[in-house]
A protein has these predicted regions:
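Two-component/phosphorelay signaling modules centered on CheY-like receiver
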Residues: 11-30
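Conserved acidic carboxylate
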Residues: 8
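Alpha4 helix (beta4-alpha4-beta5 surface) of REC/receiver domains from two-component response regulators
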Residues: 63, 78-96, 105
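Conserved phosphotransfer microenvironments
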Residues: 14, 35, 48-69, 80-82
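Acidic, metal-coordinating helix/loop segments flanking the phosphotransfer/catalytic sites
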Residues: 31-49
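C-terminal output helix
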Residues: 98-111
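A short helix->loop->beta-strand "cap" motif at the edges of active sites that frequently abuts
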Residues: 70-75
Length: 112
């Protein structure tokens, strides 16, 4: 089962993104504020996508990417300056402010 895990340090932001994804018919496995919580959710699904911000409460997005199994992809939502130098393998980026249309299209592409 492919799961989507939403991870942002601000719980309200994470919940708003989850609500947007659920309204679009996507299966959201979990919403959390730390990388450790995201890894716990990741253990419960076969593969998935982590939708996250640049800096979580307990680690940076790059640390979380290192800890996740290869069967997970990551969608980083951050300002362009945060990822100008390039992104690690398995990480896609969307710039803030984010548009719902761009988020949905990117996730649909990642799910195929």
């Amino acid at each position: 089962m492919v799961g989507i895990i939403v991870v942002f340090p601000n719980k309200d932001n994470a919940t708003n993104i989850r609500n947007l994804l659920v309204r679009a018919g996507l299966n959201v496995t979990g919403v959390c504020t730390t990388g450790a919580q995201a890894m716990n959710y990741a253990d419960s699904v076969d593969e998935g996508i982590i939708v996250c911000g640049y800096k979580l409460k307990d680690m940076m997005y790059s640390e979380l990417r290192e800890y996740l199994p290869d069967r997970f992809e990551m969608l980083l939502i951050a300002s362009q300056g945060k990822w100008e130098e390039g992104l690690a393998s398995g990480v896609m980026g969307l710039t803030m402010p984010i548009k719902a249309y761009d988020l949905m299209n990117t996730l649909q592409m990642m799910l195929q």
